[in-house]
């Protein structure tokens, strides 16, 4: 760059900083905040699939899937992990279905959890915005987008048509929220439900509720599905679960994680440690026997899981080694993911029209 252009650029940057404040514009190489803070999800394989060891702080995350697929369980596990790190969490329960006893079993400190059960979608999103702007809340869960009913719909009659109201509400709220969330370094997770598009002959007929705005604003989108049942004899004791990272702005996307959710316990950490340990050759498997550091830890996976549950020091050591092995190749910097962010950024009018066209 020639000297005249450099002077012009320096003058422009100085004017911008004078008018909008220091740090309003900067060279990407100048900032020291390229590393993205993250909160573990409670699933080691999902942390690895996300590429940065968990869900990113200062971002919007969408978790969607069919009924009883583990959406709320996964978010409660995130809350439990955040509370272990001393963070403050809030749960906006628009579905009015939060079970505090189940949350406690998953490790959530229920007494410290902020809970709101709003009457309307506007109230829920306003509460969320106020919590974010306070700068004192680190994790906010909205359960769920489908339950964020606009005030006009609640006050109207049952058969009234309210086309596009929820999509317009989400689009307006996210425009306000996204900057505040980044400034407050708060993780905001929206749980969403699946609907079917009518008359789709080709392609995937599934879509999420609330229009398209959330798809654009979310840095991470997770598709969670129940893939099978876990049985103890004839009794079903849990679900085999698969999570696909369908969008990721902080690491390469399209990875997936498989783990077990046990009823009344949550995500089975020991099962993941054994599967990943064998894959990475930290745990030796010979026939039905599993061994760690030359010592046999159990015959059959169930016994090996029992050993790790009783010997937490060994489990923590294996987890630490796995994180070092599997996350060291994915440095948590946004520079590495430039090719991933290829989508266009629509104007407000375009975003509203997109949201309205997809509302159901």
Swiss-Prot record:
Location within or outside the cell: Cytoplasm
Gene Ontology terms: biological process: DNA recombination; DNA repair; SOS response
UniProt xrefs under InterPro entries: AAA+_ATPase, DNA_recomb/repair_RecA, DNA_recomb/repair_RecA_CS, P-loop_NTPase, RecA-like_C, RecA-like_N, RecA_ATP-bd, RecA_C_sf
Record SUPFAM superfamilies: P-loop containing nucleoside triphosphate hydrolases (SSF52540), RecA protein, C-terminal domain (SSF54752)
SMART domains from the UniProt entry: AAA (SM00382)
Keywords per UniProt: ATP-binding, Cytoplasm, DNA damage, DNA recombination, DNA repair, DNA-binding, Nucleotide-binding, SOS response
GO cellular component entries: cytosol
Keyword Repeat appears in the UniProt entry: no
Binding site for ATP: 65-72
First-listed, main subcellular location of the protein, grouped into a coarse class: cytoplasm
GO molecular function: ATP binding; ATP hydrolysis activity; ATP-dependent DNA damage sensor activity; damaged DNA binding; single-stranded DNA binding
Transmembrane segments: none
Cited NCBIfam families: tigrfam_recA
Function summary: Can catalyze the hydrolysis of ATP in the presence of single-stranded DNA, the ATP-dependent uptake of single-stranded DNA by duplex DNA, and the ATP-dependent hybridization of homologous single-stranded DNAs. It interacts with LexA causing its activation and leading to its autocatalytic cleavage.
Recorded family membership: Belongs to the RecA family.
PANTHER family reported in the protein's UniProt record: MITOCHONDRIAL DNA REPAIR PROTEIN RECA HOMOLOG-RELATED, RECA
Protein name as it appears in the record: Protein RecA
UniProt organism field: Tolumonas auensis (strain DSM 9187 / NBRC 110442 / TA 4)
